[in-house]
């Protein structure tokens, strides 16, 4: 899953990247996916539920797709690098998901843990 806002950020840096180009299955809007805690449940459409398990680690294939793009997917942070190329999760409940469906996040109880890089 990738947040749609990332594509605008990348375009501003000169990269022509559209939804689906980076291999994501779902593109969201209005959710800062990479900042959600581990174990967050995302409800998509009427019945699908995904549990967030980690951050997508940018691999060398991203640079093969667009030269220099891999480095743009990494932000420096005091706790170490943070990846911004989406999140990974496991399906907890299946269901039909179509473009335009709502996505709702349910975060776990505190204390929260950051999504690990996978």
What kind of region is each of these model predictions?
Residues 1-118:
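Metal-cofactor-dependent catalytic cores
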């Amino acid at each position: 899953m990738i947040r749609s806002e990332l594509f605008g950020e990348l375009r501003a840096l000169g990269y022509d990247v559209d939804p689906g180009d980076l291999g994501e299955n779902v593109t969201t809007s209005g959710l800062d996916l990479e900042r959600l805690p581990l174990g967050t449940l995302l409800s998509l459409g009427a019945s699908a539920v995904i549990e967030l398990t980690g951050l997508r680690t940018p691999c060398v294939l991203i640079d093969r797709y667009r030269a220099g793009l891999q480095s743009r997917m990494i932000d420096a942070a005091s706790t170490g690098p943070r990846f911004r190329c989406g999140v990974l999760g496991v399906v907890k409940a299946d269901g039909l998901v179509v473009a335009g469906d709502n996505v709702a996040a349910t975060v776990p109880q505190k204390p929260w843990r950051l999504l690990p890089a996978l």
